[in-house]
Amino acid sequence: MEGPLSVFGDRSTGEAIRSQNVMAAASIANIVKSSLGPVGLDKMLVDDIGDVTITNDGATILKLLEVEHPAAKVLCELADLQDKEVGDGTTSVVIIAAELLKNADELVKQKIHPTSVISGYRLACKEAVRYINENLIINTDELGRDCLINAAKTSMSSKIIGINGDFFANMVVDAVLAVKYTDIRGQPRYPVNSVNILKAHGRSQIESMLINGYALNCVVGSQGMLKRIVNAKIACLDFSLQKTKMKLGVQVVITDPEKLDQIRQRESDITKERIQKILATGANVILTTGGIDDMCLKYFVEAGAMAVRRVLKRDLKRIAKASGASILSTLANLEGEETFEATMLGQAEEVVQERICDDELILIKNTKARTSASIILRGANDFMCDEMERSLHDALCVVKRVLESKSVVPGGGAVEAALSIYLENYATSMGSREQLAIAEFARSLLVIPNTLAVNAAQDSTDLVAKLRAFHNEAQVNPERKNLKWIGLDLVHGKPRDNKQAGVFEPTIVKVKSLKFATEAAITILRIDDLIKLHPESKDDKHGGYENAVHSGALDD
């Protein structure tokens, strides 16, 4: 009879692995916990080559961490997903997921099967989303532009630009509204990527500016070129305009020295013909990702066109989208002939090189296909400018979500407290085992107001108790249902009406973070076995060629 099956690796099962996973999740949450809320603290991260990042953004912190534990990796990916999908709420989603896991682990230790906990969590999440949509949303139509500004300010409150909240909130709202376009279905769309953010260190935050048009951090290729072109026809090229040289390995055998001159002449004529084909279509602004040599620049100067070299591929794509141009990586068509048609050109009202701040920039104004906007950020140093850019990205995403979903919910822990009370009452109406899981889900949500209060150096127990009392009153007594907007005022350390105070978050941020946190917690809860294979040794059996020779393994 054979012995038991051996697994080449470390195997841990049951309670041990579940506790391990919960601890890993809790340690990840503890890293970002102190950065939550308007008085959250920043993290300084130094990578292996010594690059420093100072940030308050949950997704950025977790992206820069080198995490080995598989369960902790799930939470890091969760923050990244929240950042890509919604753009904000990355810290809170990780904290909620870790708290859900911690409470689920307590239930499993009390001999409640993980499957019961999972089904309870799923039910609680579904009920929570339904309750938000039915009772807690505020329609943005009745609040207008103020609502957008307040949502942006709420997003920025914990960030470095929170001090100048009004200034940046107005800038963000104007930028998002500037890039609005209508898609095929007639729905308004707000592509946040169309807002180009440039950073220039020096001066103060308040001297940042919003520019109507696409700002390129480049200058014209030659001093002799025009600096301003009206009714621009833009060609976007993804190749270099330089004297064509023969490929390596090409050999030409010539018998007459004059032929050598002809070859050189032909090399320069090939590029000249390309430029003439481009200019013949009426193009007067040429943007290329490659270089343009002096010989080619001469033709553009003579034609009165503006040529810009070394444009970033990312910028070129955005300009092509905004102006209606096609990006060409070659002029060759399917027959192998080189052609350039006028339909490939984009259009803009004006392209001008201006000195803004301390740098020369090229501005592309009033593009034909879509409008575009650019923000130039000023700050004391590069770390500050980078963090300002991350903060602005979050705020832009928030404003976009509010405009697309047309609804917001009160911030400052109001939603979590309301859901906690509702789910506690809902749990008591359940007759099955899920009752305990739903009650734990309700308790887990209180981690958000709790953490907010702790980070603000307030008495969290007292504040959360008051908050729960208000929300309980709102749900029990229909006459006092306006109390459901009560959230925390962390500066003064007391509950307040966050609808009046203008603390708003997009509904989708709350709904998605609940769903994502629940799914992540369930994914980790389902794991009851971890098999970690031993890494294969790099050397072969004899430890390399030299050892093999010495040991005689190569002798026949």
UniProtKB/Swiss-Prot annotation:
Modification type Phosphotyrosine: residues: Y181
Residues holding ADP: G37, G89, T90, T91, S92, S158, K159, G412, E505
Cited function: Component of the chaperonin-containing T-complex (TRiC), a molecular chaperone complex that assists the folding of actin, tubulin and other proteins upon ATP hydrolysis. The TRiC complex mediates the folding of WRAP53/TCAB1, thereby regulating telomere maintenance. As part of the TRiC complex may play a role in the assembly of BBSome, a complex involved in ciliogenesis regulating transports vesicles to the cilia.
Positions bearing N6-acetyllysine: K199, K400, K494
Entry-linked PROSITE patterns: TCP1_1, TCP1_2, TCP1_3
Keyword Transcription regulation on entry: no
Protein name: T-complex protein 1 subunit alpha
GO cellular component: acrosomal vesicle; cell body; centrosome; chaperonin-containing T-complex; Golgi apparatus; heterochromatin; microtubule; microtubule organizing center
Reactions performed catalytically: ATP + H2O = ADP + phosphate + H(+)
Enzyme class name: hydrolase
InterPro entries: Chap_CCT_alpha, Chaperone_TCP-1, Chaperonin_TCP-1_CS, Cpn60/GroEL/TCP-1, GroEL-like_apical_dom_sf, GROEL-like_equatorial_sf, TCP-1-like_intermed_sf, TCP-1_chaperonin
Gene that encodes it: Tcp1
E.C. number: 3.6.1.-
Family designation: Belongs to the TCP-1 chaperonin family.
Keyword Lipid biosynthesis found: no
GO molecular function, one term: ATP binding
CDD domains assigned to the protein according to its UniProt record, in alphabetical order: TCP1_alpha
GO terms for biological process, alphabetical: binding of sperm to zona pellucida; chaperone mediated protein folding independent of cofactor; chaperone-mediated protein folding; positive regulation of establishment of protein localization to telomere; positive regulation of telomerase RNA localization to Cajal body; positive regulation of telomere maintenance via telomerase; protein folding; protein stabilization
Binding site for ATP: G37, G89, T90, T91
Positions contributing to Mg(2+) binding: D88
